[in-house]
């Protein structure tokens, strides 16, 4: 069964996919940041053949933004959502964005700088879900919830679901000096966080795959790139450890062709 979507990833050569002032010179005004960020998006759009103003990203709850919605909340993209000139500024509080094939050339995606982005495509029905699955979200079983949203609410069959796990911090690079405080779900992390002589190796990909396998989903493709070590990607972890060239945000997304 052939894919109906185009998946893409941006990296350092494409520019910073964020309007956060911390990624720009201190003397930049808000208008200068917006202008440069728009130019970055338009150039990325030209590269991958979509309109750089037609990018949607979920407003996902964190420990600091005080958003409150049930875990695994999804939003199905509507005509109203895509009615604005610049979709980057459309705020959709949700963990999961879902879009149907009828909305051609509308990008659904998410920023990332080490966290895996999960794309689940129902190739038969022409509907696709995306979520940002950093380790704390994997801990609360967002990968499972992302695929389950299609199965329970849109009658997707597991055999028709094809999954892409984006570039991320691989287990060889994701290491803690102690067991991570956010890893409270032992079912998720059993054998996916391993103690190697006092160093805790975290395997996000295997934790995601386990959750997908629980739903009998086996059509899974994984990006081979480690954002921490690859020169192609920004990486928060690498930046924190002193590599200033890795300061920034990548973007992983898709659109219906």
Question: Where are the model-predicted features located?
Answer:
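Active-site microenvironment for binding and transforming phosphate-containing groups
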Residues: 1-257
């Amino acid at each position: 069964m052939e894919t109906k979507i185009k998946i893409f990833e941006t990296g350092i050569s494409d520019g910073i996919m964020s309007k956060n002032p911390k990624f720009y010179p201190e003397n930049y005004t808000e208008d200068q940041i917006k202008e440069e960020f728009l130019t970055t998006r338009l150039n990325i759009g030209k590269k991958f053949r979509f309109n750089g103003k037609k990018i949607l990203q979920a407003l996902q709850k964190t420990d600091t933004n005080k958003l409150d919605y049930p875990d695994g909340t999804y939003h199905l993209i509507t005509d109203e959502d895509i009615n604005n000139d610049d979709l980057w500024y459309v705020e959709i509080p949700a963990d999961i964005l879902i879009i149907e094939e009828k909305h051609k050339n509308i990008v659904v995606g998410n920023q990332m700088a080490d966290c895996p982005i999960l794309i689940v495509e129902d190739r038969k029905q022409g509907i696709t879900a995306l979520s940002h699955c950093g380790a704390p979200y994997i801990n609360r079983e967002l990968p499972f919830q992302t695929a389950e949203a299609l199965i329970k609410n849109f009658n997707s069959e597991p055999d028709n679901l094809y999954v892409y796990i984006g570039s991320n911090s691989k287990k060889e690079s994701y290491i803690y000096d102690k067991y991570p405080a956010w890893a409270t779900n032992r079912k998720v992390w059993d054998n996916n966080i391993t103690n190697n002589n006092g160093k805790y190796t975290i395997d996000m990909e295997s934790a995601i795959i386990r959750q997908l396998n629980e739903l009998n989903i086996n059509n899974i493709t994984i990006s081979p790139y480690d954002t921490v070590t690859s020169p192609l990607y920004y990486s928060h972890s690498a930046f924190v450890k002193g590599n200033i060239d890795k300061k920034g945000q990548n973007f992983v997304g898709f659109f219906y062709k």
